[in-house]
């Protein structure tokens, strides 16, 4: 019992914490998220996930496509080996409409936090596997313009999460994101 209390005390003192996203959208209609999107802002729990152009989770979402099975196909672009590479990720549906399983980019979940379907979509990619727990979130918009309302909602959603780096893009950068 003493060892258990000591271990618990050390864990709390050392700041060991799980990254948990508690806010996901209720009643997501996957068909309404279909179409073209632009990555307006990104944030991550670990600076190394976004700090360089070729960082592991610095990806630019281009399009979301619901599949007939209820999964979500994510088309994105990412810098690899000094050039822009097109990627396709299949996010598998779960029992929770706004949560999807993935096996890509070293992540294992995609969580939709919020969307109005017409202007913005906020989502996070989570890796809950020990010891490399990580979280990266993005604010997507339908047009290559800065949407202040979407950014405010993104910042509000991030307040409850352990984010250490945040990037935002202006309209010129949105148009010039990693294009193949």
Curated annotation (Swiss-Prot):
Modification after translation (UniProt): Alternate disulfide bonds occur in equal amounts.
Disulfide cross-links: 84-178, 124-137, 124-139
Domain of life: Eukaryota
InterPro entries linked: Blactoglobulin (IPR002447), Calycin (IPR012674), Lipocalin (IPR002345), Lipocalin_CS (IPR022272), Lipocln_cytosolic_FA-bd_dom (IPR000566)
Molecular function in Gene Ontology: identical protein binding; retinol binding
Record keyword Disulfide bond present: yes
Secretion signal, residue range per the UniProt entry: 1-18
Protein function: Primary component of whey, it binds retinol and is probably involved in the transport of that molecule.
Name of the protein: Beta-lactoglobulin
Record organism: Capra hircus (Goat)
């Amino acid at each position: 019992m003493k060892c258990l209390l000591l271990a618990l005390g050390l864990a709390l003192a050392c700041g060991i914490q799980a990254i948990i996203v508690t806010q996901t959208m209720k009643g997501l209609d996957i068909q309404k998220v279909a179409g073209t999107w632009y990555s307006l802002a990104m944030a991550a729990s670990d600076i190394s996930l976004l700090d360089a152009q070729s960082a592991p989770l610095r990806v630019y979402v281009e399009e979301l496509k619901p599949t007939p099975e209820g999964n979500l196909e994510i088309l994105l672009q990412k810098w690899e080996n000094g050039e822009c590479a097109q990627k396709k990720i299949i996010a598998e549906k779960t029992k929770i409409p706004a949560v999807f399983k993935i096996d890509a980019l070293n992540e294992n979940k995609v969580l939709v936090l919020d969307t109005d379907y017409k202007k913005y979509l906020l989502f996070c990619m989570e890796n809950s596997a020990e010891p490399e727990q990580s979280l990266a979130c993005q604010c997507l918009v339908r047009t290559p313009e800065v949407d202040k309302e979407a950014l405010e909602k993104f910042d509000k959603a991030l307040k409850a999460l352990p984010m250490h780096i945040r990037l935002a893009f202006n309209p010129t950068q949105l148009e010039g994101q990693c294009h193949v």
